[in-house]
């Protein structure tokens, strides 16, 4: 018969403590990886959701496109921006750093705007939307109170 109650809890705590103490960098790496993947997914979803701005005719290929309005995430047209978003986790001497990168050449122009184009942020809102969940991930992992 399976053990239950306090015995299982103590066993779980022992395994968790061993995992964290034996390899804290690997444990922290996995928490940062989960967090960056979460933000990456939210940023991509916000772009793929579509725009609410003006709709116009595209001619190559012939189709309609609804652009994003000021202040909302950019609307996907070709999928290049979404496909350029990736995340990685790097270990340095003193830290584990998670990065979410949009490598499309125009990504920063959309995120922050230009003189002629108002910002259409997608990364910062994705981070802000997931901030409570990221805090829960690190709290559950034992790194913050």
Tell where the protein language model's regions lie, with residue ranges.
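Short, Lys/Arg-rich flexible segments
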Residues: 1-145
């Amino acid at each position: 018969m399976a053990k239950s109650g306090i015995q299982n809890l103590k066993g779980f705590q022992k395994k968790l403590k061993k995992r964290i103490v034996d390899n804290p960098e690997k444990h922290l790496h996995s928490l940062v990886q989960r967090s960056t993947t979460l933000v990456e997914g939210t940023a991509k979803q916000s772009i793929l959701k579509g725009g609410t701005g003006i709709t116009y005719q595209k001619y190559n290929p012939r189709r309609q496109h609804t652009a994003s309005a000021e202040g909302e995430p950019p609307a996907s047209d070709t999928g290049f921006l979404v496909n350029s978003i990736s995340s990685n986790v790097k270990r340095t001497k003193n830290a584990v750093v998670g990065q979410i990168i949009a490598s499309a050449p125009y990504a920063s122009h959309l995120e922050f705007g230009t003189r002629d184009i108002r910002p259409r942020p997608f990364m910062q809102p994705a981070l802000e939307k997931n901030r409570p969940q990221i805090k829960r991930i690190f709290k559950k992992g034992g790194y913050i109170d």
